[in-house]
């Protein structure tokens, strides 16, 4: 059983590489544009493959249109990949938008903004302390 899992994982990895090449080099559909294949999850019986993809687009409507274009071309993409892989049965492809990359970038930007805001507040607070200390030093010197 463990051997079955490793075989499906190896097939998924090879399928991911082949899909990335096919989508980059062989697909001429302008609706799809630049697509990145993040992961491929193959069923145990190799009949289905979930292909997780991302795009540079953030607009949900455009992303949905691109996923629909990929789904419409799934049979053609499947035939191109089947010619490159030596499998008895080529899995049926299902394209799924993977928003984890976009969410990760959004979270990274939020963290960076909070850090820069915090540094600005600390600097401002430090400048205020310097001003109050220098005024205290001047008042002590007058006595």
Curated annotation (Swiss-Prot):
List the residue ranges of the region (Disordered).
116-143
Where in the cell does this protein reside? Cytoplasm
Q: Gene encoding this polypeptide?
A: rbfA
> What's the name of the protein?
Ribosome-binding factor A
Tell me, in a sentence or two, what this protein's role is. One of several proteins that assist in the late maturation steps of the functional core of the 30S ribosomal subunit. Associates with free 30S ribosomal subunits (but not with 30S subunits that are part of 70S ribosomes or polysomes). Required for efficient processing of 16S rRNA. May interact with the 5'-terminal helix region of 16S rRNA.
GO cellular component terms attached to this protein's record: cytosol
Q: Where is the composition biased (Basic and acidic residues)?
A: 116-128
Gene Ontology process terms (BP): maturation of SSU-rRNA
Please describe the quaternary structure of this protein.
Monomer. Binds 30S ribosomal subunits, but not 50S ribosomal subunits or 70S ribosomes.
């Amino acid at each position: 059983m463990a051997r079955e899992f490793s075989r499906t994982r190896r097939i998924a990895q090879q399928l991911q590489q082949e899909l990335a090449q096919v989508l980059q080099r062989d697909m001429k559909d302008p609706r799809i544009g630049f697509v990145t294949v993040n992961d491929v999850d193959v069923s145990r019986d190799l009949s289905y493959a979930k292909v997780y993809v991302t795009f540079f687009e953030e607009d949900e409507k455009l992303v949905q249109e691109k996923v629909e274009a990929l789904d419409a071309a799934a049979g053609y993409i499947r035939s191109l990949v089947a010619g490159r892989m030596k499998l008895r049965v080529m899995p049926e492809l299902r394209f799924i938008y993977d928003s984890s990359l976009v969410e990760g970038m959004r979270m990274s930007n939020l963290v960076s903004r909070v850090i820069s805001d915090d540094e600005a507040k600390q600097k401002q607070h430090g400048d205020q302390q310097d001003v109050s200390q220098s005024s205290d030093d001047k008042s002590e010197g007058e006595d």
